[in-house]
Amino acid sequence: MPLIDVCPLSELPTGARRTVEHDDVEILVVNCDGEILAMEDRCSHDDGDLADGELDVAACQIECPRHGARFDLRSGCPLTLPAYEPVDTFPVVLDGDTIKLEVD
């Protein structure tokens, strides 16, 4: 499976987020208290950008800024309505100090 570079780990401290694009898909990368997680940057309810939403680092959840749907960053599963479909997640690989994502 191909890997894409995101950034050095030192540039993504706890609570920070970053987006990268791969094949016209925006991917949100978040540092949840040292755990690096990646998911598609789109709410499954209406395609809103999740990167602009409120991040709960302790619970590893993000809230869509449009209608308040919350998503688990580990699984991509919606936790509250109006979203009911999960969003894609991506495996994260640490290569030295570089964060990389497995994409297909």
Where does each model-flagged region fall?
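Short amphipathic
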Residues: 2-8
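Short coil-to-beta-strand transition motifs
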Residues: 1-2, 87
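Solvent-exposed, conformationally flexible loop/turn segments
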Residues: 12-15
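Rieske [2Fe-2S] iron-sulfur-binding domain
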Residues: 17-104
